[in-house]
């Protein structure tokens, strides 16, 4: 098969006494996200999308939250591992589209830095990476500022 599509979704709750890390960068906010790893909800959704495109399960299978080895893990390392698996199967990023769903903090000032990190980690051109943010107009848990949700869709192209 020449192309594959993967979809990833993740949610994390606010409340951790640590920095808010999204796409590997620190985003100023009053609290971080609760998680076994560093809580980078964006990279978790992208990792799941890549694994899904390759029919390799999900990040819970590869990096279980019951394994102390992944406690506080840098999600960029996890993402790079997932991408390496895709490369081993002969695939590269065609394009990636990410939607961050959060009432706060505002994402716009950080979007270009996020795109640059992703392009670097996924060894692709910046114009293959899109990151956007939206709110739920104060509805639901994201609207009440209880957490952040992320959806990611990736098109993987066979390059062998």
Swiss-Prot record:
The keyword Metal-binding applies. Keywords: Isoprene biosynthesis, Lyase, Metal-binding. Its EC number is 4.6.1.12. Its cofactor is a divalent metal cation. InterPro entries: MECDP_synthase, MECDP_synthase_CS, MECDP_synthase_sf. This is 2-C-methyl-D-erythritol 2,4-cyclodiphosphate synthase. Homotrimer. It comes from Shewanella amazonensis (strain ATCC BAA-1098 / SB2B). 4-CDP-2-C-methyl-D-erythritol 2-phosphate binds at residues 10-12, 36-37, 58-60, 63-67, 102-108, 134-137, 141, 144. GO terms for molecular function: 2-C-methyl-D-erythritol 2,4-cyclodiphosphate synthase activity; metal ion binding. Binds 1 divalent metal cation per subunit. The record marks 36, 135 as: Transition state stabilizer.
């Amino acid at each position: 098969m020449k192309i594959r599509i993967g979809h990833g979704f993740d949610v994390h709750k606010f409340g951790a006494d640590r920095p808010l890390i999204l796409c590997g960068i620190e985003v100023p906010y009053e609290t971080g996200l609760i998680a076994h790893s560093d809580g980078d909800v964006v990279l978790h959704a992208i990792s799941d999308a890549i694994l899904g495109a390759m029919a390799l399960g999900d990040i819970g299978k590869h990096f279980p939250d019951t394994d102390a080895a992944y406690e506080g893990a840098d999600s960029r390392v996890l993402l790079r591992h997932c991408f390496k698996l895709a490369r081993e199967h002969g695939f590269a990023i065609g394009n990636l589209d990410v939607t961050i769903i959060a009432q706060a903090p505002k994402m716009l000032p950080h979007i270009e830095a996020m795109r640059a990190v992703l392009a670097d980690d996924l060894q692709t051109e910046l114009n293959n990476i899109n990151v956007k943010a939206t709110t739920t107009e104060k509805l639901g848990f994201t609207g009440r500022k209880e957490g952040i949700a992320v959806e990611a869709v990736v098109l993987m192209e066979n390059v062998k």
